[in-house]
Design a protein with these regions (language model features):
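Contiguous, glycine/small-aliphatic-enriched amphipathic segments in soluble metabolic enzymes
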Residues: 1-96, 149-193
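Structural signal for conserved beta-strand scaffold positions within catalytic alpha/beta enzyme cores
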Residues: 13, 33, 117-120, 128
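Short glycine/proline-enriched loop/turn "hinge" motifs that connect secondary-structure elements
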Residues: 22-26, 118-123
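Generic beta-strand structural signal
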Residues: 73, 113-116, 124-125
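Acidic/polar active-site rim loop that often engages polyanionic ligands
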Residues: 77-80, 126-134
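Active-site loop-to-helix "anion-binding N-cap" substructures in soluble metabolic enzymes
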Residues: 90-92, 110, 118
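Active-site glycine-rich loop that binds ribose-phosphate moieties when present
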Residues: 96-113, 133-160
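Mobile beta-alpha loop/short-helix "lid" or hinge segments that flank ligand
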Residues: 119-127, 180-184
């Protein structure tokens, strides 16, 4: 893909994932239609089960391709949670759906594969302690166990990233450990909050 963030690459449809590297080498964005279009496309602006089904099928297809190593990463667009529910999907959003697909791929029970959502760029990485729950539930989710799990997941990921970035550290130089800041629930969190 082009290095310039402002340059939009040309979108090129591909029939198979194997065509993607050649298309990308020509500074184009390879796009594979993951699931067939229905005879009638869902109407814009209307919440429909058909749209939810197409979104779920597309995410499932792309996630499985990524888990198989056919893709380096998965980028998802916003999905409508109500349309997902109308399509019969039990997940409130992407994160839970991707967690279930990853657990299925590894043969791990979903409960044994906790995940968190990270918003990241080169300057800042932010990990959410909870998602897709009400404010009351989010406040209740701020427990020592939940926070430690979030910090542990984040630490493992960042340590792996730092190790990758410093592939061959100089002799006698320790690998840098991730430093993680934890924001309080409200500004005076340390004042009996």
């Amino acid at each position: 893909l082009p290095d310039q963030a402002h340059a939009l690459p040309h979108i090129t449809p591909v029939q198979d994932w194997h065509q993607a590297p050649a298309v990308a080498a020509n500074n184009a964005l390879p796009v594979l239609q993951a699931c067939p279009s229905p005879a009638t496309l869902p109407a814009f602006g209307q919440i429909q089960a058909t749209a939810g089904r197409m979104a779920a099928d597309s995410i499932t297809h792309a996630a499985r391709a990524t888990l198989r190593g056919q893709c380096a990463a998965l980028v998802t667009a916003p999905i409508h949670k109500e349309a997902l529910a109308l399509a019969g999907e039990p997940f409130p959003g992407h994160t839970e759906m991707l967690q279930a697909l990853a657990a299925q791929h590894t043969g791990t029970p979903v409960a044994d594969m906790p995940v968190r959502m990270m918003l990241a760029n080169a300057e800042l990485k932010t990990v959410l302690n909870s998602i897709h729950i009400s404010l009351r539930q989010a406040i209740e989710a701020v427990t020592q166990e939940q926070l430690l799990q979030t910090i542990t997941i984040t630490h493992r990921f960042l340590a792996q990233q730092l190790q990758t970035q410093t592939s061959t550290p100089a002799a006698n130089q320790p690998t840098r450990a991730p430093i993680i800041a934890v924001a309080g629930l409200h500004p005076p969190a340390g004042q009996v909050g």
